């Protein structure tokens, strides 16, 4: 499931995309280790742990800009693919979830990854102090908005699903 993103091209970046608690932060380090390339961690999580989760739109723009800066720095080093634990597209979806609108900065942003891995919500939601959308309907809406953002942007993406090693196998089946 998904569009584009087949083999044959050198990918500069692979982005882990999707709502809260689907295993992105578990897969990210493992995928970076598999390729021997950098991992850009979830900038929004670091921001939330430092500043709290009572976000204004300006906070989300700051998160997106911070993540974009770290990504550009990693890409400039030339070790590919850089693994991104989310990016500004995901922060745009957060804006949609929290406020029902987004700052124009998000739609103007042009730094999309070469491949997006959309993580299914087939794992249990786990509270960690920064997560907000644990109810089934909220998780489904978050997933649907995440998928819609990828489709709206027309970027290559693939669905990642499965429990335990099956999830890793799903990732490896797409990324090699």
Give residue spans per PLM region.
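Pre-Walker A (Motif I) flank of P-loop NTPase domains
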Residues: 10-13
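A glycine- and Lys/Arg-enriched "phosphate-lid" helix/loop adjacent to the NTP-binding pocket
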Residues: 99-172
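The conserved Walker
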Residues: 20
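Short, Lys/Arg-enriched N-terminal segments with co-localized hydrophobic residues
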Residues: 1-8
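Conserved substrate/cofactor phosphate-moiety recognition/catalytic segment
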Residues: 29-72, 171
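Hydrophobic anchor at the beta1->P-loop junction of P-loop NTPases
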Residues: 16
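Conserved nucleotide-sensing/catalytic segment adjacent to the nucleotide-binding pocket
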Residues: 53-99
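Conserved lysine of the Walker
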Residues: 24
